[in-house]
Amino acid sequence: MKQTKTKYGKMKQIVSNLKLPDYRYEQLTKAIFHQRIDNFDDMHILPKVLRMSLVNEFGKNVSSVIPVFSQDSKQAQKLLFELTDGERIEAVGLKYKQGWESFCISSQCGCGFGCRFCATGSAGFKRNLTADEITDQLLYFYFNDHRLNSISFMGMGEAFANPELFDAVKILTDQNLFGLSQRRITISTIGIIPGIQSLTQKFPQVNLAFSLHSPFESQRSDLMPINKRFPLNQVMKTLDEHIIHTGRRVFIAYIMLEGINDSKEHAEAVVGLLKNRGSWEHLYHIDLIPYNSTDKTTFKFQSSNAIKQFCSTLKKAGISATVRTQFGSEISAACGQLCYENEL
């Protein structure tokens, strides 16, 4: 028998063990996701024996992550969460015009892949998050009256390196739980080929973002050691297969590093990488990202004029490209800046 791993599976098992009718589980999930009740004792629609059993199993709160520090800017909120074993992770909430809210969540405590420009990698890898720890980050925001309009796995860690990623996505897309559309979820990867292939088969409508950062194999291997294990040419073939199978656009992230990957030669090589791939090549979209400075690395911010020139070269060649609007860099909540601290 398959072991019940997630809290929602355990909740269903508790209802069954108490020989309660199935509708009690439905009442429980509605209390969480419709009424936004975080405390089991406050779910008065449930019988006392069930509430007591839930508290004994999970503690008094539905969400297991504890916020220990919050930092806000005009459009971003960065939260430092403490987990039950004392490890810490960060998540970011972003507010856009017309009330749209997007959340960037972590999949690992730290990261072991050592991308040279990323602050998270400097912390090293501690452990994978459980599916509950991943989704509990969102529960915290939800219980605090936020709207979960879109979710991105762009926080700490490489999502495809966590075996519980797809359990988390299953929870997020379960219509009796979070009920998110697959198209409201984006998973970012540095190029873990087996993970991309699994996403293609299991959740074909989930958005996929690939971190490129250099079109040259040797330089990419220097910036991102994962390229030695999964070379760029092989990753691109896997992305082609993903597009052919799903018919969905793939977003390619390209962080602009001054004097490193911002030359005209780089722009032309990106064009060469994406052109003449096949009838699906129009479904590749480049997101140019201004580098966000951090005290963990020595790379420098690129000027807006240089980024515009790079973008212009791509567009003139027929490549779909935009310069990403950045939120949260002033509170170290933007791309590549997440790095938990024991004391903030």
Swiss-Prot record:
<comment type="similarity">
    <text>Belongs to the radical SAM superfamily. RlmN family. Cfr subfamily.</text>
</comment>
<dbReference type="GO" id="GO:0030488">
    <property type="term" value="P:tRNA methylation"/>
</dbReference>
<keyword id="KW-0046">Antibiotic resistance</keyword>
<dbReference type="GO" id="GO:0005737">
    <property type="term" value="C:cytoplasm"/>
</dbReference>
<feature type="disulfide bond" description="(transient)">
    <location>
        <begin position="104"/>
        <end position="335"/>
    </location>
</feature>
<dbReference type="GO" id="GO:0019843">
    <property type="term" value="F:rRNA binding"/>
</dbReference>
<keyword id="KW-0004">4Fe-4S</keyword>
<dbReference type="GO" id="GO:0046872">
    <property type="term" value="F:metal ion binding"/>
</dbReference>
<feature type="binding site">
    <location>
        <position position="111"/>
    </location>
    <ligand>
        <name>[4Fe-4S] cluster</name>
    </ligand>
</feature>
<feature type="binding site">
    <location>
        <position position="118"/>
    </location>
    <ligand>
        <name>[4Fe-4S] cluster</name>
    </ligand>
</feature>
<feature type="binding site">
    <location>
        <position position="115"/>
    </location>
    <ligand>
        <name>[4Fe-4S] cluster</name>
    </ligand>
</feature>
<feature type="binding site">
    <location>
        <position position="188"/>
    </location>
    <ligand>
        <name>S-adenosyl-L-methionine</name>
    </ligand>
</feature>
<dbReference type="GO" id="GO:0051539">
    <property type="term" value="F:4 iron, 4 sulfur cluster binding"/>
</dbReference>
<dbReference type="InterPro" id="IPR013785">
    <property type="entry name" value="Aldolase_TIM"/>
</dbReference>
<feature type="binding site">
    <location>
        <position position="292"/>
    </location>
    <ligand>
        <name>S-adenosyl-L-methionine</name>
    </ligand>
</feature>
<dbReference type="InterPro" id="IPR007197">
    <property type="entry name" value="rSAM"/>
</dbReference>
<feature type="domain" description="Radical SAM core">
    <location>
        <begin position="97"/>
        <end position="330"/>
    </location>
</feature>
<comment type="function">
    <text>Specifically methylates position 8 of adenine 2503 in 23S rRNA. Confers resistance to some classes of antibiotics.</text>
</comment>
<keyword id="KW-0489">Methyltransferase</keyword>
<keyword id="KW-1015">Disulfide bond</keyword>
<keyword id="KW-0963">Cytoplasm</keyword>
<feature type="binding site">
    <location>
        <begin position="211"/>
        <end position="213"/>
    </location>
    <ligand>
        <name>S-adenosyl-L-methionine</name>
    </ligand>
</feature>
<protein>
    <recommendedName>
        <fullName>Ribosomal RNA large subunit methyltransferase Cfr</fullName>
        <ecNumber>2.1.1.224</ecNumber>
    </recommendedName>
</protein>
<keyword id="KW-0808">Transferase</keyword>
<feature type="active site" description="S-methylcysteine intermediate">
    <location>
        <position position="335"/>
    </location>
</feature>
<keyword id="KW-0698">rRNA processing</keyword>
<dbReference type="GO" id="GO:0046677">
    <property type="term" value="P:response to antibiotic"/>
</dbReference>
<feature type="binding site">
    <location>
        <begin position="157"/>
        <end position="158"/>
    </location>
    <ligand>
        <name>S-adenosyl-L-methionine</name>
    </ligand>
</feature>
<dbReference type="GO" id="GO:0070475">
    <property type="term" value="P:rRNA base methylation"/>
</dbReference>
<dbReference type="InterPro" id="IPR004383">
    <property type="entry name" value="rRNA_lsu_MTrfase_RlmN/Cfr"/>
</dbReference>
<keyword id="KW-0949">S-adenosyl-L-methionine</keyword>
<dbReference type="InterPro" id="IPR040072">
    <property type="entry name" value="Methyltransferase_A"/>
</dbReference>
<keyword id="KW-0411">Iron-sulfur</keyword>
<dbReference type="InterPro" id="IPR022881">
    <property type="entry name" value="rRNA_lsu_MeTfrase_Cfr"/>
</dbReference>
<keyword id="KW-0408">Iron</keyword>
<feature type="active site" description="Proton acceptor">
    <location>
        <position position="90"/>
    </location>
</feature>
<dbReference type="Pfam" id="PF04055">
    <property type="entry name" value="Radical_SAM"/>
</dbReference>
<keyword id="KW-0479">Metal-binding</keyword>
<dbReference type="GO" id="GO:0016433">
    <property type="term" value="F:rRNA (adenine) methyltransferase activity"/>
</dbReference>
